[in-house]
Amino acid sequence: MSLDERIITQAILETYFEKFKSSLDLDVAIVGGGPSGMTAARLLAADGFNVALFERKLSLGGGMWGGGMTFNMIVVQEESVHLLTDVGVPVKRYKDNYFTADAVAATTTLASAACLAGAKIFNCMSVEDVMLREENGVKRVTGIVINSSPVEIAGLHVDPVVLGSKYLVEATGHAVEVLQTLVRKNDVRLNTPSGGIEGEQSMWADTAEINTVKNTREIFPGLYVAGMAANASYGSYRMGPIFGGMLLSGEKVAADIAAKLKG
């Protein structure tokens, strides 16, 4: 049977917009496709929730691809190993509490597992703002404002569109881009000591890994922080090419949001 290029185009258009239309009212929107975002997306989707992940770049993975300084191996600690092995990533013990995995295998498998669990992935999609509603004087995040990344990169004056979500996960890493926009544009106070973004400190892997999980929480009504964004929001340290805290943060934010959605 000969191929018709028009049908190829039609297939892409119809199936993509079916996926897009099913994301108009999400249970959870996740911004950022690093290890914490991918883990959260997989677990929430596997739990039956309507979940979509938005990644500005063409590929998912955040900083995981390059390991340390482009030496593409990563390290995780023992308590997080299950979040790799559960999806089929081979892990090797290096020393007590130090396990290694191939960075490319880990990244691609985490991304695939999220998709296969039912999470919808929108790459090349930038989240430029949030949607807010106010009830009884309390503001709450109720959705995301999105645009095509090429539009953003080219600096074109093109209006975005909006998707609703019951909860939003800020997992954009060091830059905390969603929170930066929320704070800059609105008279709001975050659930932090100062009421603002505390800022990331320098390298201290042990404390950073502990705090990545500890700081994973609802920082503003309807908005959670996870991964490195959690530490940047609450003023903790960076950790470098050890990824256990990121994975555990994704697991924690998924569990916390699932508990709220189940009511």
Curated annotation (Swiss-Prot):
GO terms for molecular function: iron ion binding; pentosyltransferase activity. This is Thiamine thiazole synthase. Pathway: Cofactor biosynthesis; thiamine diphosphate biosynthesis. InterPro entries: FAD/NAD-bd_sf (IPR036188), Thi4_fam (IPR002922), Thi4_prok (IPR022828). Keywords: Iron, Metal-binding, NAD, Thiamine biosynthesis, Transferase. It catalyses: hydrogen sulfide + glycine + NAD(+) = ADP-5-ethyl-4-methylthiazole-2-carboxylate + nicotinamide + 3 H2O + H(+). Involved in the biosynthesis of the thiazole moiety of thiamine. Catalyzes the conversion of NAD and glycine to adenosine diphosphate 5-(2-hydroxyethyl)-4-methylthiazole-2-carboxylate (ADT), an adenylated thiazole intermediate, using free sulfide as a source of sulfur. The gene is thi4. Homooctamer; tetramer of dimers. Its EC number is 2.4.2.59. Glycine binds at R238. NAD(+) binds at S36, E55, R56, G63, V127, H157, V158, D159, M228. Belongs to the THI4 family. Fe cation binds at D159, H174. Its cofactor is Fe(2+). GO terms for biological process: thiamine biosynthetic process; thiamine diphosphate biosynthetic process; thiazole biosynthetic process.
